Swiss-Prot record:
This is Envoplakin. PROSITE patterns: SH3. Residues 12-28 are annotated as: 4 X 4 AA tandem repeats of K-G-S-P. May form a homodimer or a heterodimer with PPL. It comes from Homo sapiens (Human). Residues 1674-2033 are annotated as: Globular 2. GO terms for cellular component: cornified envelope; cytosol; desmosome; extracellular exosome; intermediate filament cytoskeleton; membrane. Residues 71-84 have a biased composition (Polar residues).
């Protein structure tokens, strides 16, 4: 029907893009899908309704035509009822269409306006048909003096009341209904305007004013409804998203069995860093919108505040849950870390115990040295034991802080206390942070039952609680490990003593050694004792130093701890020095004693002890010195860290505490200057960061020395590295924040200046406008002049509207910029530490400057509007005055003419003239009478015509009343619901059929016309069609297989361990010694062991995954073969027909309809049950009300929060709860009291009162005849009332028309008077507006006073309640006792728990399926990293073919003969585990339904009891009144028994029917689930394909547009370059002429400088001679040394190694090794002080060479700036020594100062941060610098290219080319620092001009690469040329420069790449490679500055000279005026090496 729907595919509401699946929060994509489905159903329903309206219109036209013919032929009208019914149906459908089109506009349908136009056309046609209907069937003969009349005042008043009485909300459904009704009402009001424009009469002005008020009120209500709908929709979406996030946190398992804590932590950190701030901003935006709407007095304040409160509470609960999640994650991580470390300690203790049992039992016949060696090994074991002891002590300390997580899942055996982590308020349950509760029940893992301090029990989320530490199991395990450690220490001591004893026994001589030999050698014994003592003291020192080295520093006070250690270390060093002296003395004594060759056991042990002491002393000495260096470096580093942190924290605090921009004139400029000052201060503090990095390097070197020599890892180094990185990041973040804020404020200042200028101009113009007023003395000429001037002024005011709009636009832009500034400040503040963020002052929501600008904008708009209105009003006054003056002049002319005629005529003529005038007067009277008669005839004819035409709006009024009829409203809603339901079903079925048909046709056509491989991508997307259950089953089988393999591997590992233990228990031999040492050395590094185990496990897992993938391929092959054999005999055409038959199986449709009917019956039964239950509740309440209410004197008021409103609400709820509990207890007590009375009454014989019987029977008896008569009379009364109302309305209408007609006939000539009466006196609209504002002010004052009174009352109530607190607690306990029935509570908790368990199981299954699917995808992704890539590709290709074949076979439906599709589906769904879980779920569901049935049965029992009570009571009455019949007849008792039996039978049958309905419902659910799954997957696939097609088309269009733009820009750039070259050439020629004279002057100056230089050099030589002579007299020497040692990180382990070890292992090649050996040096600065001053010399102690610094300064190898940099410490001595020596290395990339890779840093691909990576030697070449600057041959100096161009030494084009070459090879070169900078950095440092930035940026892309717009990957320029993203002509010069300077550059790799390797890797094409290799064909685009000939870049490099200091290439150039002078100069210029 709609014309809009035929213009595109969007007609059915298909969206232009499909949201991505699996969004992080999930809500936006679901909303989008829901909106899309709703839009599709809406459009289909509208289509159906519009078609029906069209049919009704056509049928009505036919029937009206027939009845019109019958009326003309005077026959009876036949189709009046059918026509009226059709028109009513069309009106109902039109109402629905208006509602639907408004909803479609809100859902942003692209063709909503066209649909609305179509609906309006239908409405006009229906209106026209209604008019024809009334004209034909409702003809009315009116009297001739009565015409049609509409009482507009009453109609408009009714509409005004209807608009004012309109409600808002409170929900979205009601709001949508209200919007639709208002749209209909708005259309009616707009239609009234057309009638009122032509209204004429005395009340026309009043009615129009009333209509304007109505129109304003209607438009205001429409705007209010729209804004309310937008706000409520945003709140609803945000609430749903918050609820989903809360559900995820609450449903998480926080016990020790948590599935993936690391994944949850990553997800939480990602959400906290990237999503939390945006979500908070959206919530704050919604709150701000709500507050703004409330402040603006929005009529829907109630719904807005309700949603605001709900959103605020949900957001607070969500933040509290985030706190809970953080705490629970910390508990889980601490628990797991403790368990892992405990396992490690346990394994270490077991290993040590086994070693003690196996290794340290010496053989009886072993050699004598074996015990000594075992003692040495035992010392190593003792060190390991000491480490384990420290770890055990740490575990014991930490065990007291570990939370008992297993108790969260175990039921408490005894009362257990839990703490609340956060505040929680769910309405029913409130928790406070830090409160302690008692855990009652934790069977539900997600909701615990806890008991509060007051004894009340509540069910709260388990995530909000934590069980306080300690964990008994953790404490017990730590104690157990400590006991095991003590036992092991005792065992170690026993073994050590045994070994010492055996060593002493083995050293005794076996010959005739007398037993008293020891006594014969007392000196030997004394020396041995002294050596033992020295050995013990050295061991103690070693242990002390190792303890210092191993123990980490104190986290709170690292500096104090480190200073204390250094102080202790100094004492230890002094003690070690004294021990060394003592050792030397003892050594001399021992050597002297041993020279005498003594005998005896002590003498034999003495050499061994002496060697041991010497070795240990040397080791301890080295260890002590290394630790001292490490401690000093760490101390320096810690101080630097604190200094840097203090500096950076100061800047951060300044930024955080920055005040908002004030509303002052120069505030923006002041803020810019302040930011610039802070930026300068930050740059000044850069040295602090540099010192920090140098201190870190020194600390790393010291730690590396300690680790290489003693294998002692520094525990504090990783922490210090992290702190340094964090400080560096914070420093850069501060700089970025300052730059960003400065840029924003500068832009805002510029915009503010523009706004200020525009505002000032407009304000000045408005103030100086001419003020012309109308004066009574003004004549016609003055009035005309003023009128013309006023018209010009009005036109000028209208033309100034553009300036006002510009000012408004600038104001909005400026406010947005300031808002952005504040947002950036808030974002940065949130990213800092909480301490800084908390200390920051509270910033206002709107900046003062922003408020000032907003106020200025409002004042300007107000002033402009007032001036425009005043001038327009003055213009109207002038026009009115002009008209009045014209009339006055005309009347005066007539009067003067008449007076002149009368004075000139005679009396006779006056008499004749009077007769003639009388005759003429009579004739005029006759003519007037005739004209009046004709006028009356025409009026009568007009009246007749008016009576024939119906008034359309009158019928519209009736339609509105028809809509408001309550009975018709109810029937209309029911019919509407039925129509909507049927429309939805029809639309869904139609959409499914269309989608299925289209899909079948498309697949058939594609299968016939396309090749199979073209369907690969689509098949891959359809691959997800198999059921999740089958995938889960397969994955579970694979997991079981993996677990089995793990068990086999673990068993094998245990066997290997046993074999290893058996081998270790064997006798110790010589070979075993090496093995033991090796083992001890490896065992020290536990991280390496864990990494090796992880690598082995990963390799085994990879092998298992690959094997599983191959097995999966084999299974798929077997499955394909089976399917092919099964479907080999199937014909495709028959299958296609069978598909259609299966799709439209009538049996299934009948079954579906039958099931739907059964479902409807069950729903009706459920509704009946609900009604019965509600009736029971109502009756129960009636029974309760029969007792007097129990009013307690003390009410419970539990105050949980300080907020008075919350406190009042809680008090009300608790009072209500107490009241209900009291009522229940009272009712129960009353029932117990009444039961014996009831028995007594039943046993008694009632008395008889016949009088009351008669009265009651007559009063309560209702005869059916009487009821029918009453109903008939009521209907008749309603008809009479309706007819009277219609007659009354008709009477009022006719009277109004009569009065109007009389007034029209009574008017003679009052038009002029009525027009002149309308004057601009007081605007009634403004008066009403002022009155309304006054009323609002009064109401606001009343509300404020009421609020103050309410606050005062609440405060008084709060004080009263606080005084009554002690009494409330007692009452609370009593209330708790009288709560609900325990059995019912237990039954309810059990039911809710089982339901939650089932939901949790289902979610757990879904989570497992997702995890397994992710594991499968991860396994498939890991296959790509295997070495055999070709085999993998073949397997994937085969897998795609197999899956394609499977998909085709599965899509091919079976034949008629083979209906096995359902059987196959059943086979696929059958899985043992799944069936078991399904059966368990079904059993649980049956149990729950049984329990529900029991509850229903109990409800029925209660109903029966209540009925018995009521019957008993009623029987008391009845028996009391009719005792004779009831007491004597026993038939009633028999009837009652029979009814009870029937009731039991019906109950049993009903339960059976409910069971059958349950089974049918399950079958229906399964069928509907299956159908929904199929339809959803099909729609998703269709949407995905449509989206892909649209995306492809969009990208193609963008590509074509970009290509066109690129071509246009290329042409523009070429034209600009031509113009620029011409301009620069002309300027260069002019500058050359001007520079000739300047060059001559400079030559003279240079000659004078040369002479001065020669004299200064002569003076320096003389001073040197004098100083050398004086050196012999007095000389002092000061030495400063620095040794440079190069270490290389091993790529796998990260250990340091020397270059020689790296060369031996093959990590670097020989050339690199030689270069690194050359770089190693040991520089020493020797400063000699004499009478002539100081002289410094650099000495290389490695080679013995000396270099003088003064000589280097004289020879200009170094500059004074470099020497000062070295003295200040900014230049390392290694680099300074190279400069002084004048040595240039062939590669700058291997220098000590630049071990940083020169590869581009903008590449998104991952790069290795290690310089010496294994890929370094794969053909990558070194890069050399391009032409870096200009060598001035006239002054013998170097200068930059910018300076050379400025001096006209170099033409601009050549300078531009040289700069582009630098940018293309790594950056612009700074000649002073030899550093390279990017284009932007170079522009900031002044190395280049701003005019050439764009070309340099284009050249820089050759180094950094470009981003592929499609794949978002980083491409080199060669790849970009191949893909067509860049033209080859613009790229070729940059590639040529890269090739000439060392090789091409790939932004994804390090170093330079030769052309051949680049060609092999696909970086460049063959054609481009040939162009690059042909160097002779390079374009000569450079100009030689000296010879002015054209050069290529290669030739220019050949003519360059090398700077001796930096090795940079400098192009020779000279000023033209100096070439002759330099050639004739006798001084030979210094050559450049």
């Amino acid at each position: 029907m709609f014309k809009g729907l035929s213009k595109g595919s969007q007609g059915k509401g298909s969206p232009k893009g499909s949201p991505a699946k699996g969004s992080p929060k999930g809500s936006p994509s679901r909303h989008s899908r829901a909106a899309t489905q709703e839009l599709a159903l809406l459009i289909s329903r509208m289509q159906a309704n519009a078609d029906q309206v069209e049919r009704d219109i056509l049928e009505t036209q036919k029937r009206l035509q027939q009845d019109r013919l019958n009326s003309e032929q005077s026959q009876a009208l036949q189709h009046q009822q059918e026509t009226g019914r059709s028109l009513k149906e069309a009106e109902v459908l039109l109402k629905d269409l208006f509602l639907d089109v408004d909803k479609a506009r809100r859902l942003k349908h692209p063709q909503a306006e066209e649909i609305e136009k179509d609906i309006k056309q239908l409405h006009e046609r229906v209106t026209q048909e209604c008019a024809e209907y009334r004209a034909l069937y409702e003809k009315m003969v009116l009297p001739p003096d009565v015409g049609p009349r509409v009482d507009w005042a009453r109609v408009l008043e009714q509409k005004q009341k209807q608009v004012c009485a309109g409600q808002y909300g409170p929900g979205m459904a009601e709001l949508e209904q209200q919007i639709a009704e208002h749209n209909i009402l708005q259309k009616e009001i707009d239609a009234y305007g057309q009638q009122l424009r032509s209204l004429v009469g005395p009340d026309a002005a009043t009615i129009r004013s009333q209509y304007r008020d109505l129109l304003k009120a209607a438009s205001w209500r429409g705007q209010s409804l729209g804004s309310l709908y937008t706000h409520l929709q945003g709140c609803t979406r945000q609430l749903s998203a918050l609820a989903e996030q809360q559900r995820r946190i609450l449903q998480q398992d926080w016990s020790d069995l948590m599935a993936d804590p690391a994944g949850v932590r990553r997800e939480y950190e990602h959400f906290k860093q990237h999503e939390l701030l945006s979500q908070e901003q959206s919530v704050n935006q919604l709150e701000d919108d709500g507050e703004r709407m409330v402040e603006l007095r929005h009529p829907a304040v109630g719904p807005i505040q309700a949603h605001q409160e709900a959103l605020k509470m949900e957001w607070q609960n969500f933040l509290n849950l985030c706190i809970c999640q953080e705490t629970q994650l910390q508990h889980v991580e601490d628990y797991r870390r403790f368990q892992e470390e405990a396992d490690s300690v346990s394994q270490t203790l077991a290993k040590l115990n086994s070693n003690l049992d196996a290794k340290y039992s010496p053989a009886p016949g072993g050699p004598p040295g074996a015990p000594t060696e075992l003692l040495q090994q035992l010392e190593a074991e003792e060190k390991r034991l000491a480490v384990t002891e420290r770890a055990t002590g740490d575990l014991q300390r930490r065990s007291r802080d570990v939370a008992p997580l297993p108790q969260r899942r175990n039921p408490p055996q005894q009362p257990l206390h839990v703490d609340s982590i956060c505040d929680w308020d769910s309405g029913e349950v409130q928790l406070l942070q830090g409160e302690r509760y008692k855990l009652v029940d934790n069977t539900d893992p997600h909701a615990w039952v806890v008991q509060g301090p007051g004894g009340e029990t509540k069910r709260a989320p388990a995530a909000c609680f934590c069980i306080p530490a300690p964990d008994p199991d953790a404490v017990a395990r730590a104690s157990r490990l400590a006991s095991e450690l003590q036992a092991l220490k005792q065992k170690l001591a026993t073994v050590q003593s045994r070994l010492k004893a055996s060593a002493v026994e083995s050293l005794r001589p076996s010959q005739q050694a007398p037993s008293g030999s020891d006594l014969a050698n007392p000196q030997a014994q004394k020396l041995l004792t002294q050596m033992t003592r020295l050995d013990g003291d050295l061991g103690q020192i070693e242990r002390q130093v190792l303890a210092w080295a191993r123990a980490p520093l104190s986290r709170p006070t690292p500096l104090e701890d480190l200073e204390g250690r250094i102080h202790s270390h100094e004492g230890t060093a002094q003690r070690l020095q004294s021990l060394g002296t003592e050792k030397e003395t003892a050594q001399k004594e021992c050597e002297a004693f041993l020279s005498t060759r003594p005998v005896g056991p002590a003498a034999l042990q003495l050499p061994v002890a002496l060697n041991s002491v010497k070795n240990k002393f040397s080791d301890v000495q080295v260890l002590c010195s290394l630790y001292g260096e490490k401690a000093k470096a760490a101390l320096d580093l810690e101080r630097q860290i604190q200094d840097a942190d203090r500096v950076i924290r100061g800047f951060e605090a300044t930024l955080v505490q920055e005040a908002p921009i004030p509303a002052e004139p120069g505030a923006l400029q002041e803020r810019v200057s302040e930011l610039q000052r802070q930026r300068r201060e930050l740059l000044e503090q850069q040295t602090c960061v540099l010192r920090l990095h140098r201190a870190l390097k020194a600390s790393e070197h010291a730690c590396a020395a300690l680790q290489n020599n003693f294998q002692e890892f520094c525990q504090d180094l990783p922490r210090q590295q992290r702190q340094v990185r964090a400080l560096t990041d914070r420093y850069h973040a501060v700089g970025d924040q300052l730059d960003l804020r400065e840029k924003v404020v500068q832009d805002a200042a510029l915009t503010y200046q523009q706004f200020k200028n525009c505002k000032d101009n407009l304000s000045s113009w408005l103030e100086h406008l001419p003020r012309s007023q109308v004066r009574p003395s003004d004549g016609p000429s003055q009035i005309a002049y003023k009128l013309q001037a006023q018209k010009r002024l009005t036109q000028e005011i209208q033309s100034r509207e553009r300036d006002r709009a510009t000012a408004s636009h600038l104001s909005q832009a400026l406010q947005a910029a300031l808002q952005d500034y504040e947002l950036q400040a808030d974002t940065y503040r949130c990213s800092l530490e909480p301490t800084l963020a908390v200390s920051a002052p509270k910033r206002p929501r709107v900046a003062p400057l922003q408020e000032s600008i907003q106020a200025q904008e409002k004042n300007l708009a107000k002033a402009y509007t007032e001036v425009a209105a005043a001038q327009q009003q003055l213009l109207q006054q002038l026009e009115f005055a002009r008209k009045m003056l014209e009339k006055k002049e005309l009347s005066e002319d007539i009067r003067r003419t008449h007076d002149a005629k009368q004075g000139s005529e005679s009396p006779a003529q006056a008499g004749r003239e009077s007769e003639a005038l009388k005759a003429q007067l009579e004739e005029e009277r006759k003519r007037v009478a005739r004209v009046q008669h004709e006028l009356e005839a025409q009026r009568s004819q007009l009246l007749q015509l008016r009576t024939q035409r119906p008034l359309e709006r009158l019928e519209e009024k009736e339609v509105v009343e028809f809509y408001r009829d309550p009975q018709l409203e109810g029937s209309l809603s029911r019919v509407k619901a039925q129509v909507e339901e049927e429309g939805k079903r029809r639309a869904g079925l139609q959409a499914d059929l269309e989608v299925a048909a289209q899909k079948v046709v498309q697949l058939e056509s594609k299968r016939k016309t396309m090749q199979p491989h073209l369907l690969t991508k689509e098949v891959t997307q359809v691959e997800r069609d198999p059921g999740l259950d089958s995938q889960a089953a397969q994955l579970r089988i694979q997991i079981q297989q993996l677990r089995g393999e793990d068990a086999v591997i673990s068993a094998r590992l245990e066997g290997l361990k046993k074999e290893l233990l058996a081998l270790e228990k064997r006798e110790v031999d010589v070979k075993e010694k090496v093995v033991v040492k090796e083992v001890v050395k490896v065992e020290k590094n536990l991280e390496m062991v864990k990494a090796a185990q992880a690598l082995r496990l990963q390799m085994e897992e990879d092998a298992a995954r690959r094997k599983q993938a191959e097995e999966a391929v084999a299974k798929l092959q077997a499955r394909i073969e089976d399917l092919e054999r099964a479907i080999s005999s199937v014909e495709p055409k028959v299958i296609v027909k069978e598909v259609k038959k299966v799709e439209q199986d009538p049996g299934l449709l009948q079954e579906s309809s039958r099931l739907r009917s059964l479902l409807e019956e069950e729903r009706t039964k459920n509704a009946t049950l609900a009604r019965e239950l509600s009736d029971l509740h109502s009756k129960y309440s009636v029974v309760e009300k029969q007792r007097p209410k129990v009013q307690l004197q003390e009410r419970v008021h539990e105050i949980f929060q300080v907020d008075p409103e919350t406190e009042q609400e809680i008090t009300r709820l608790k009072a209500k709860l107490q009241e209900m509990a009291g009522k229940r207890s009272g009712v129960e007590k009353e029932v117990e009291k009444l039961l014996p009375d009831l028995e007594v009454l039943r046993a008694q014989k009632p008395t008889v009162e016949y009088k009351e019987v008669t009265q009651e029977v007559v009063r309560h008896e209702r005869s059916p005849e009487v009821l029918r008569e009453i109903d008939r009379l009521k209907a008749q009364l309603n008809e009479l009332v309706n007819s009277h109302g219609r007659s009354q309305e008709q009477l009022i209408r006719l009277q109004g028309e009569r009065d109007e007609w009389r007034r029209e006939r009574a008017k003679v000539e009052t038009k002029t008077v009525s027009k002149e009466v309308v004057r601009h006196e007081k605007d009634p609209v403004l008066e009403k507006e002022a009155e309304r504002l006054r009323q609002e002010v009064r109401e606001a004052a009343q509300k404020r006073r009421a609020a103050e009174d309410a606050v005062y009352e609440l405060q008084s109530k709060r004080l009263l309640l606080e005084r009554r607190k002690p009494e409330e607690k007692v009452v609370v306990q009593e209330v708790v006792v009288t709560q609900k029935d325990p059995k019912l509570r237990e039954e309810h908790s059990r039911l809710s728990g089982s339901l939650d368990e089932e939901v949790g199981r289902r979610r757990q299954l879904e989570l497992e399926v997702q995890q397994l699917r992710a594991g499968v995808e991860e396994q498939e992704g890991l296959l790509s990293f295997q070495e055999d890539r070709s085999k993998k590709l073949a397997v994937e290709r085969e897998l795609r073919q197999l899956t394609l074949r499977i998909q085709e076979l599965e899509k091919r439906p079976p034949t008629v003969q083979e209906k096995i599709i359902m059987e196959e589906v059943v086979k696929l769904e059958k899985d043992p585990d799944l069936e078991k879980s399904t059966e368990a779920l079904r059993w649980d569901l049956d149990q729950e339904k049984t329990q529900v049935t029991e509850l229903n049965r109990e409800c029925k029992n209660l109903q029966v009891q209540i009925d018995v009570l009521q019957k008993a009571k009623s029987q008391e009455k009845t028996i009391y009144k009719e005792v004779i019949r009831v007491q004597k007849d026993r038939v009633l008792e028999d009837e009652r028994a029979r009814v009870w039996e029937m009731l039991n039978r019906e109950r049993t049958a009903r339960q059976a029917r409910e069971e059958e309905a349950r089974r049918l419902r399950e079958r229906i659910d399964r069928a509907e689930t299956l159908g929904r799954t199929w339809s959803r997957e099909e729609s998703e696939l269709q949407r995905a394909r449509d989206q892909a097609d649209q995306e492809c088309g969009r990208l193609q269009q963008e590509l074509r547009a970009l290509e066109r733009q690129k071509q246009q820009q290329t042409l523009q750039l070429q034209e600009e370059s031509k113009l620029l070259s011409q301009k620069t050439e002309s300027e260069r020629q002019k500058a050359a002429q001007r520079g000739q004279e300047l060059s001559r002057l400079e030559a003279a100056i240079l000659r004078e400088k040369d002479q001065i230089y020669e004299k200064e050099r002569t003076l320096r030589d003389l001073h040197a001679k004098v100083s050398r002579e004086e050196l012999s007299q007095e000389t002092q020497t000061r030495e400063t040394n620095l040794s440079t040692k190069i270490s290389i990180l091993e790529p796998e382990t990260g250990k340091d190694m020397s270059p020689y070890e790296a060369y031996k292992r093959g990590i670097i090649d020989r050339g690199q090794y030689l270069q690194l050996q050359e770089l190693e040096c040991d520089w020493e600065e020797v400063t000699t002080s004499g009478p002539c001053g100081e002289e410094s010399v650099l000495l290389d102690r490695k080679s013995g060479k000396q270099y003088s610094i003064e000589a280097a300064l004289r020879c200009r190898r170094i500059s004074k700036e470099e020497y000062h940099l070295y003295k200040d410490g900014h230049l390392p001595i290694s680099e300074f020594a190279l400069l002084v020596a004048g040595e240039t290395k062939p590669s700058s990339s291997l220098s000590i100062g630049s071990i940083i890779s020169k590869s581009p840093l903008a590449s998104p691909a991952p790069q290795s941060t290690s310089f010496f990576s294994p890929s370094f030697s794969l053909g990558l070449g070194d890069d050399s610098f391009p032409i870096a600057g200009i060598y001035d041959t006239t002054t013998d100096n170097k200068c930059s290219i910018k300076t050379a161009v400025a001096k006209n030494m170099l033409d601009p084009i050549t300078g531009q080319k040289l700069l582009e070459a630098q940018a293309a090879t790594g950056g612009i070169v700074d000649l002073l620092s030899r550093e390279r900078y990017s284009v932007h950095k170079a522009m900031e440092r002044g190395l280049i001009e701003n005019t050439s930035t764009q070309r340099l940026l284009n050249a820089q892309k050759a180094f950094t690469g470009i981003e592929d717009p499609v794949t978002k990957k980083r491409l080199s320029v060669g790849e970009a040329v191949q893909k067509g993203w860049m033209p080859r002509e613009s790229v070729l010069p940059h590639l040529q420069v890269q090739h000439l300077t060392g090789g091409l550059i790939d932004p994804k790799r390090t170093g330079r790449i030769p052309i051949q390797q680049a060609l092999l890797s696909g970086m460049i094409s063959e054609e481009l490679a040939q162009l690059l290799q042909d160097e002779s064909s390079y374009e000569k685009d450079l100009t030689d500055p000296i010879s002015k000939e054209r050069l290529s870049y290669k030739e220019a490099m050949g003519r360059c000279r090398k700077d001796p200091l930096s090795g940079l290439l400098l192009l020779p150039a000279a000023l033209e005026g100096y070439r002759c002078y330099r050639s004739a100069s006798p001084t030979v210029p210094r050559s450049l090496r």
